[in-house]
Regions:
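Rossmann-like NAD(P)(H) cofactor-binding subdomain of soluble oxidoreductases
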Residues: 1-79, 83
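NAD(P)-dependent Rossmann-like dehydrogenase/reductase catalytic/cofactor-binding core
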Residues: 151-219
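Aromatic-residue-lined binding/catalytic grooves and analogous aromatic/hydrophobic interfacial grooves
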Residues: 121
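Internal alpha-helical scaffold of NAD(P)-dependent oxidoreductase catalytic cores
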Residues: 49-60, 76-113, 125-163, 208
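Short pre-catalytic strand/loop immediately N-terminal to key active-site residues, enriched for Gly-Thr
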Residues: 62, 111-116, 168-173
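Glycine-rich beta-alpha junction loops
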Residues: 43-45, 66-70, 118, 152-154, ...
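Small-residue helix-packing motif on alpha-helices
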Residues: 3, 19, 50, 142-149, ...
Length: 219
């Protein structure tokens, strides 16, 4: 109760179906608050639904969706805000989360796509690192050698994209010498449909995210 009475920023980290009952429990306090910011980490729970419970335009509402690399300060955090939230409040949240990774403010309607790309993305990358590791072991590297090489390759390659600002296709082309090993591997990956499979995986994650939102709304 004291938290809802005195805090300027409250992070709410419960299940989506638990948030509205929680807000209803403290509605008497929330009715009297101004300059309060509630930050929800519940997937799929729309800001409008929380606003309908609180019924106080002076309470700012923010949705965030972090991914697991926030645990080592290298995460992606998607953020959407209600109209009552000021730029100063967003800056405050950014400051509080600065040690967790990069924060990207987006429209609320894009939260589910962002979840599919960034929230689910680490699992897809782990699969690719694992596959490259297994390939290296099959070619004679020790598992430790192959794993370290594959993981470092992903890290360095990602940093190249971020620091150069170049399109990934241009950076890929720079690695592919005519008639060389790399272009042979790239062509084979195109033949087996790697690009399409990754796109399909992200789309499947997005579809399931929307299904979970609908399931939570029924609870």
């Amino acid at each position: 109760e004291q938290v809802f009475q005195e805090a300027e920023v409250i992070f709410v980290g419960v299940k989506p179906y638990q948030i509205c009952p929680l807000l209803e429990e403290y509605q008497g306090i929330l009715d009297q608050r101004s300059n309060l910011l509630l930050v929800s980490m519940a997937a799929g729970l729309e800001l409008e639904k929380m606003a309908d419970v609180i019924q106080n335009d002076q309470v700012g509402l923010i949705r965030i969706m972090p991914n697991t690399p926030v645990a080592i300060g290298q995460g992606v955090i998607s953020l959407a805000r209600s109209q009552a939230v000021t730029d100063q409040q967003v800056a405050k949240v950014n400051q509080l989360l600065s040690g967790a990774g990069a924060l990207y403010e987006i429209e609320e309607k894009l939260m589910d796509p962002a979840t599919a790309v960034a929230g689910c993305g680490p699992a897809f990358v782990y699969q690719m690192i694992e596959a490259m590791t297994d390939a290296g072991v099959g070619l004679g590297l020790t598992r430790e050698q192959a794993l370290q090489m594959a993981a470092q390759t992903f890290q360095g390659t990602s940093q190249m994209v971020l620091e150069t600002g170049e399109h990934p296709a241009r950076l890929r082309d720079a690695v592919c010498s005519p008639g060389g090993s790399t272009i042979a591997g790239v062509n084979r990956l195109e033949q087996v449909g790697l690009r399409g499979d990754i796109i399909a995986g992200v789309e499947a994650a997005y579809k399931r995210t929307q299904e979970m939102v609908q399931e939570a709304a029924k609870k």
